[in-house]
Regions:
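Short terminal alpha-helical segments
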Residues: 1-26
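Short intrinsically disordered terminal tails
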Residues: 1-4, 19, 62, 83-92
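Acidic, low-complexity, intrinsically disordered interaction modules
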Residues: 20-83
């Protein structure tokens, strides 16, 4: 079972990589896997992190078609949080 520490360590590892390099993509997949597992396990803290990330992506000008936005919405939708996903989708 993953926890906050695992997630934060994966984020730190990703930060050390050049953006969009092969190493960064590997680390990003790790971050996304941990986040997905935590939400699937019912971790409300991780759900909050996903929601915060969606707000940040919206503030940065990302669009509904952006991969990061689609992935975060999918995590919510596929774990029984369809209403929250729909609410978040309206920001984009």
């Amino acid at each position: 079972m993953y926890n906050r520490e695992d997630y934060r360590e994966a984020l730190e590892e990703r930060e050390k990589c050049d953006l969009h390099s092969d190493e960064w993509r590997f680390c990003q997949a790790k971050v996304q896997s941990i986040a997905t597992a935590m939400v699937a396990a019912g971790n409300n803290w991780m759900v909050g992190e996903i929601i915060d990330e969606l707000y940040s992506l919206s503030d940065c000008g990302c669009e509904l078609t952006d991969e990061a936005v689609r992935f975060d919405l999918w995590i919510l939708e596929s774990n029984g949080l369809e209403e929250k996903a729909e609410e978040m989708e309206k920001m984009f």
